[in-house]
């Protein structure tokens, strides 16, 4: 699987192979960014903490592995090829249930990590 953009072509499978053995908890790699959108590879070996994004919508697909998405009090099992949409303000977290989950995450507008607000459940 490749990711083609005006700046470069990235081999996503190769990026995953390079990183999968060294991930301890969660690792994030920025793939592309404009003022309107940003794309990340997210490696999750454990679990995210419950949080929401005050100013960003998030769409992600599971490229590898499987896990559970907790979204606004609902739990849904996800596997490779599944997609999720998380609107801004929605409390959520992903919990890996395999050796490693790899997600392709797309934020709109572009995400800088500053609006991730942790919550207690």
From Swiss-Prot:
Taxonomically, which superkingdom?
Bacteria
> Pfam families recorded for this chain?
Cupin_2
Instruction: Give the signal peptide as a residue range, or say none if absent.
Output: none
Residue intervals of the Cupin type-2 domain = 47-101
- The identity of this protein, by name, is Uncharacterized protein aq_1978
Provenance organism: Aquifex aeolicus (strain VF5)
């Amino acid at each position: 699987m490749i990711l083609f953009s005006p700046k470069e072509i990235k081999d996503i499978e190769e990026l995953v192979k390079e990183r999968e053995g060294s991930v301890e908890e969660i690792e994030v790699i920025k793939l592309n960014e404009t003022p309107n959108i940003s794309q990340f590879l997210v490696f999750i070996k454990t679990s995210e903490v419950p949080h929401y994004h005050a100013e960003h919508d998030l769409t992600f697909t599971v490229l590898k592995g499987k896990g559970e998405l907790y979204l606004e009090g609902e739990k849904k099992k996800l596997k490779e090829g599944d997609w999720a949409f998380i609107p801004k303000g929605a409390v959520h977290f992903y919990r890996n249930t395999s050796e490693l989950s790899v997600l392709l995450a797309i934020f709109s507008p572009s995400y800088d990590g500053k609006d991730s607000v942790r919550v207690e459940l």
